[in-house]
Design a protein with these regions (language model features):
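Conserved helicase NTPase catalytic core signature
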Residues: 1-64
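Conserved helicase motor core of SF1/SF2 NTP-dependent helicases
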Residues: 41-43, 51-378
Length: 378
């Protein structure tokens, strides 16, 4: 290209020349930069303050625009520093997803037991993210500065339909899919907009299947001394589902077609830390094929990520109809919306279907019983 020789020389100077040369280039780069990227926490660091002073000196200037993404996951303190650095602030987030991560349920319970009710109520208020407070306040005071995006491009429409009802209040026409039907179902895996997976397991998955609920009706259990939950029936079901996927016609072809490591990974998500620990143990011990790339985590830590294939372990199942963490629609929304091509949810279908939010999601899925699947993969 026109500038290839200059760029190549610049790269050589940066990597080969002495320290003084590299520092010279860095100073020249800083003085001409027009875009600075940083996390919220880095914005308060000495490193970024030095860059700020280099750009603006001691003048009380500010960045023309500060754009803050994933703002619903930021605490008020994390949001405050970047917000004072800009003449114009654009805050982007989704208050239908999870707020800043903290184990507030355990903290609140402990404080109430210690008769610290006022402090417990204060911490409970953090369940509503600062982004949601700003969004709702701005909408009341000056609606013109608030905009709502209504179109998603991540997932196949059939997966989107499992979460669309979470946005029905804000979006008059509901959540829209920005992918054309002919693009979504394009059998060329890497074609623009393709969400085709091509997997076939007769009686379980076809290429046109994108959202499945696998019914497992075993009850949860609580490890001694823990506030978390495990469901051993679902642990067995995860192993069965993965074996089924590996045996599926088209699975290896699909995996070979994916170039990025993260696109080959199967995401395994659960709502509970104890279940996450057990799944990690299974993978480490080889009970889940270690040659299969997997990304395993709790739903809170999966926010912001996506994978082609997602398996979710819901965990909760009891006679008392207690859903715990799993009842939070933000947690459901984040979990289900991580999948691009195939979503498989494992859980007690009858138990969760009694919850109105889950019922709407489940009704948009194909249904299969784990016993049927176990028979297929023998």
């Amino acid at each position: 290209t026109k500038y290839a020789s200059v760029i190549n020389q610049w790269k050589r100077d940066l990597t080969v020349r002495d320290r003084n040369t590299r520092e010279y280039f860095y100073e020249a780069y800083k003085s001409n930069v027009n875009l600075v990227a940083a996390t919220c926490s880095i914005c308060g660091s000495k490193q970024l303050q030095e860059i700020y002073k280099y750009l603006f000196g001691n003048n009380e200037n500010a960045f023309d625009v500060v754009i803050m993404d994933e703002a619903s996951k930021a605490t008020p303190l994390e949001m405050s520093v970047p917000m004072v650095w800009g003449k114009k602030i654009i805050i982007i987030g989704d208050h239908k997803q999870l707020p800043p991560m903290m184990n507030e349920n355990n903290i609140i319970t402990s404080l109430k037991k210690a008769n610290q009710k006022v402090l417990a109520e204060t911490i409970e208020s953090f369940k509503e993210s600062q982004f949601e407070i700003l969004f709702r306040t701005a909408f009341k005071l000056k609606p013109s500065i608030v905009a709502t995006l209504d179109t998603q491009y991540r997932m196949h429409k059939k997966i989107m339909d499992t979460i669309g009802h979470f946005y029905s209040e804000e979006l008059e026409e509901g959540l829209k899919c920005g992918l054309a039907d002919e693009d979504m179902d394009n059998e060329q895996y890497n074609a623009r907009g393709s969400r085709y997976h091509g997997l076939t397991i007769p009686g379980f998955i076809e290429p046109q299947t994108h959202a499945i609920w696998v019914n497992v009706n075993t009850y949860e259990s609580q490890p001694s001394g823990s506030t978390s939950y495990v469901n051993y029936g679902e642990l067995d079901a995860i192993k069965t589902v993965i074996k089924a996927l590996q045996k599926a016609d088209g699975f290896q072809k699909f995996m070979d077609s994916q170039e990025k490591p993260e696109d080959k990974e199967i995401g395994i998500i659960t709502f509970y830390g104890a279940q996450y620990g057990k799944i990690k143990e299974m993978y480490k011990d080889g009970k889940i094929d270690k040659s299969l790339p997997c990304r395993i985590n709790v739903v809170d830590k999966f926010q912001g990520m996506e994978r082609n294939i997602i398996i979710i372990s819901t965990v909760r199942s009891n006679k008392e109809k207690h859903y715990g963490f799993a009842e939070d629609i933000r947690r459901i929304n984040v979990g289900f919306s991580r999948a691009r091509r195939l979503l498989i949810v494992i859980g007690n279908r009858d138990f969760f279907r009694e919850n109105a939010h889950y019922k709407k999601s489940i009704d948009e899925m194909d249904h299969f019983d784990i016993k049927q699947l176990q028979h297929l993969v023998r």
